[in-house]
Design a protein with these regions (language model features):
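Membrane-interfacial terminal anchoring regions of lipid-handling membrane enzymes
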Residues: 1-689
Length: 689
């Protein structure tokens, strides 16, 4: 009935195969049980005068997919009845078994329409409806691939049982089909299909089910169902067609709404990926952080990571899209649910052991203030536990700083920072966020920080980690070394993120208006403030990775205007309303860690202070500053650092230090104005906590 939709092309592994398919001794072995695939083969044979597959001739068979009675059971492979008949026939040694694959649709890079791409072949087993749509949209782009024949003489001349011959032939065919499919559509990266069985059959999950069921078969089956349900809830389901659509959509997004997504440091990641398992740990400032990293890895031909996402994002429609892009879902709290905990951990461990790259946000959720949040220990602890089981010890954490000149969620961040209760994620909240897609959003930056080698870190901070092994069946939180090293690693990740900050135009502008709102400000005054901020960051930056915008202060002011952060604009002055200033707090906080030490100095010196008194006061408060702002400077180097800052502030005339070591602000009005800006940065940040 639908044959008119199918216009297949014949492809051959070798020229000899083209000749062999005309022989009446041919037996076709199709890779699937699909009637559409069989129709494509029949039509190809008729068009090219090949031996035609017919039931009465018994000259074809179709391999069947593995089936299980219940999802949590081990799948059972079924061999075709026709293959059993061939194995029982002594004349089969003269037959020519030619494996046949049918592919629907072009490769992603050659596809001419996104709908056709969705319904092209992939590793996922399709329903009848999906297969029908595949034929409707890609029937005229079908190809029938004829493999080299099996060595039937070697197989069927052996004096073995027919059951053994069936099993051997079945395995040879499936291996051939899998290799060819991988070459045609890429490797099977759908961990949902390949990992669930391994998770459910892991010793820790089976042991937990056994303990929970107390010897009751009924309870055991119920626990198995629960475990399967949890695994389905957790696992990702990567899809090449969806990833291709992601690529097209995101390419448009970054280059139309933003002035592109600039990635820094990707070259070293290409080198690291050859020898290491990679764990990506980005800062989390926007919903689109999920997409930014995956997009850049995809365009740079690096393995797509498996992304840890909160279960709150597992929404209808959206959850499916995120799964197809590599997200797997994690509940906010495991609570007393030991079975869920075991299933989740085994899933993470299997990904880790099989060499997948993993991405998670150490902060757990998006920052609403713009400052990095305290890292959550859960995933970090699980990764360390998994690491003990690995034979391969090359694992690198990759801290990543993601910085935007404008985030999509600015208004919701403002409401929540003012005390409004955080709203539960739903489709309406997501769509209200992306409504700002129509606006100009400036630049976005993604910079890789200094990698952290996990083995080296553990060797330094927990020397006995290889000897003090973790028994997964016990309460691992009681391991003191694990309890101590987990927050240390989390803080190191956050510190390396801060060391890779890309300073944006909006963050400099926001810092420059820290003590100004609801009044006009001269643009020249504002421009001078921004120049001072740039100079201070450049002079005292504690990492060479920290980047500043390569545009003038006047251009920064104009860009912030273009981003619609302020409305009142005249040739020589502008005015920031209280609401506009509040909206920009987020961006000021993005770079506060680069200015907080100078802000402290300027605040303390607003009244004359002896240098040694300032240093002593600073050393007392510095541990708290270091903790809150994830600053790299060690406690032993703190005094040296503050002395350098004092000298640098003196050089740019913000401070005076007289012969009696008395520190005070400059007498110059412009410099005194800039000093007030720094002092207000301190007042609005650290002292408010």
């Amino acid at each position: 009935m639908i044959n008119f939709l199918i216009s297949p092309e014949a492809e051959f592994e070798t020229e000899d195969v083209k000749r062999l398919v005309q022989s009446q001794k041919v037996i076709y072995a199709l890779s699937t049980g699909s009637s559409f695939d069989l129709n494509a083969l029949i039509k190809t044979a008729k068009q090219n005068n090949f031996s035609q597959p017919k039931k009465n001739k018994k000259n074809f068979f179709q391999l069947k997919g593995a089936k299980r009675l219940f999802p949590w059971q081990k799948p059972r492979r079924r061999s075709p009845r026709e293959l059993h008949q061939i194995a029982s026939d002594s004349k089969s040694v003269d037959k020519i078994i030619i494996p046949v694959d049918v592919f629907w649709g072009k490769a992603p890079e050659r596809q001419d329409h996104w709908v056709k791409l969705i319904f092209r072949d992939s590793w996922e087993a399709g329903s009848f409806l999906r297969n029908l749509l595949k034929v409707i949209f890609n029937g005229r782009q079908a190809s029938v691939f004829f493999h080299k024949p099996l060595e039937t003489e070697d197989i069927f001349s052996q004096k073995r049982s027919s059951a053994h011959l069936v099993l051997k032939t079945d395995r040879l065919l499936r291996a051939r089909f899998r290799k060819n499919r991988q070459a045609k559509i890429g490797p099977d990266i759908s961990n949902k299909r390949t990992l669930i069985h391994a998770i459910l059959n892991s010793s820790s999950v089976k042991q937990e089910i056994k303990l929970s069921s107390n010897g009751s078969k009924k309870l055991e089956n119920n626990e198995k169902k629960k475990a399967y349900k949890y695994a389905l809830e957790i696992c990702s389901d990567i899809s090449y067609p969806v990833i291709y659509l992601y690529d097209k959509a995101l390419n448009w997004f970054w280059n139309s709404r933003y002035d592109g997504l600039e990635i820094l440091g990707i070259e070293k990641i290409n080198d690291l990926a050859v020898e290491n398992s990679l764990i990506y740990t980005p800062s989390h400032r926007s919903h689109i952080d999920y997409l930014a990293l995956s997009y850049e890895l995809y365009t740079n031909n690096l393995m797509l990571p498996q992304i840890v996402a909160g279960k709150n994002l597992n929404l209808p429609f959206l959850g499916r899209i995120l799964r197809n892009g590599g997200a797997f879902f994690m509940r906010r709290s495991f609570g007393p649910n030991r079975l869920y905990s075991k299933v989740f951990f085994e899933h993470l461990r299997k990904l880790f052991q099989r060499g997948y790259s993993i991405e998670f946000f150490p902060e757990g959720g998006r920052t609403r203030t713009g400052r990095l949040l305290t890292p959550r220990p859960g995933i970090i602890s699980m990764i360390i536990k998994s690491f003990q089981d690995m034979d391969e010890r090359n694992v690198k954490f990759l801290p990543i700083s993601i910085n935007y000149e404008k985030v999509l969620e600015g208004k919701s961040h403002l409401k929540e920072s003012r005390g409004q209760k955080k709203k539960k994620e739903n489709l309406s909240s997501i769509f209200s966020t992306i409504s700002d897609f129509r606006s100009y959003l400036g630049n976005a930056y993604l910079q890789f920080g200094e990698p952290i080698d996990l083995k080296s870190f553990l060797d330094k901070h927990a020397p006995n980690w290889q000897k003090d092994l973790i028994d997964l069946s016990e309460d691992t939180d009681k391991k003191s070394w694990l309890f101590e090293v987990t927050p240390l690693l989390g803080n190191k990740i956050m510190t390396n993120i801060n060391k890779a900050t890309v300073v944006t135009s909006s963050s400099l502008f926001a810092s420059s208006i820290s003590d100004i709102s609801d009044k006009e400000i001269d643009k020249k005054r504002l421009s001078f403030r921004i120049e001072v901020l740039k100079k201070v960051i450049e002079t005292d930056k504690y990492s060479e990775l920290i980047k500043l915008p390569n545009i003038t202060s006047d251009e920064i002011i104009q860009k912030v205007k273009k981003l619609k952060f302020y409305k009142y604009d005249k040739p020589k002055v502008l005015k920031i309303s209280k609401n506009e200033k509040s909206l920009m707090e987020f961006y000021k906080n993005n770079i506060l860690h680069l200015l907080i030490l100078q802000a402290y100095v300027m605040y303390k010196s607003r009244k004359k202070i002896i240098k040694n008194d300032l240093i002593n006061d600073f050393l007392e408060i510095f541990p708290q500053i270091k903790k809150d702002f994830f600053i790299e400077i060690s406690l032993s180097n703190a005094e040296k650092k503050i002395c350098n800052i004092l000298e640098n502030l003196k050089k740019i005339n913000l401070l005076k230090i007289d012969s009696n070591s008395e520190i005070s602000w400059s007498d110059n009005e412009k410099e005194k104005d800039a000093a007030g800006m720094f002092a207000s940065l301190w007042l609005e940040s650290f002292s408010a906590n």
